């Protein structure tokens, strides 16, 4: 498996800004970013906003940004990718790190996942191709990740377009860094939800999402 600290070391060399929407497949990488990435890190509200922030950062620093997301968030990212970052518009280099939920294996079999990830998983690579974005697929077996990531950054800068790194399940190893110790909050997630539920008036309509 890939060491997140090694991965972030490469990010530090080529980028000074990371933003995105957290994904469970990327959690071992993301848990190390705050303690080891030297640039700015912003957790965004949605993938489209992330692309916008990445564009703004590049225009001010001339260094390509990194945007992370789950493949389900590609739909939200499409508009700014093709209406702003595209080579026919402002031609903005950046590296997308995309967690591949519902991934399809090399033997064409699909890994079992939640129902909402089935079609998305099957269509992820075709969607990236249709956006005319160069990409690499990595897994826990990927060798020489330094070269893979360096090549992707340099290509993005050369062609002045976004490039993507598609991440399979179990790619990054879990570390127990002192810099990334869990923060102690007064309320757990479950207790917070319980408080919200008990405060909602009866017969209220509640809309929620993942």
What are these language model-derived features?
Residues 1-129, 133, 137-158, 163-210:
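Thiamine diphosphate
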């Amino acid at each position: 498996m890939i060491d997140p600290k090694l991965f972030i070391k490469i990010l530090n060399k080529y980028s000074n800004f990371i933003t995105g929407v957290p994904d469970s497949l990327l959690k071992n990488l993301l848990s190390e970013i705050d303690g080891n990435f030297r640039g700015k890190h912003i957790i965004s509200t949605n993938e489209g906003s992330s692309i916008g922030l990445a564009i703004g950062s590049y225009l001010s620093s001339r260094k390509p940004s990194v945007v992370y997301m789950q493949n389900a968030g590609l739909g939200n990212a499409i508009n700014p990718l093709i209406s702003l970052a595209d080579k026919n518009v402002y031609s903005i280099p950046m590296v997308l790190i995309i967690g591949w939920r519902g991934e399809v294996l090399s033997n064409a079999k699909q890994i079992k996942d939640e129902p909402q990830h089935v079609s998305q998983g099957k269509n992820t690579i075709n969607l990236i191709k249709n956006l005319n974005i160069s990409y690499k697929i990595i897994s826990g077996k990927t060798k020489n990740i330094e070269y893979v990531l360096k090549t992707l950054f340099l290509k993005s800068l050369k062609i002045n377009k976004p490039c993507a790194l598609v991440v399979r399940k179990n790619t990054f190893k879990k570390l127990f860094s002192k810099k990334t110790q869990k923060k102690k909050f007064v309320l757990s997630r479950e207790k917070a939800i319980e408080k919200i539920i008990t405060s909602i008036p009866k017969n209220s309509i509640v809309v929620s999402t993942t």
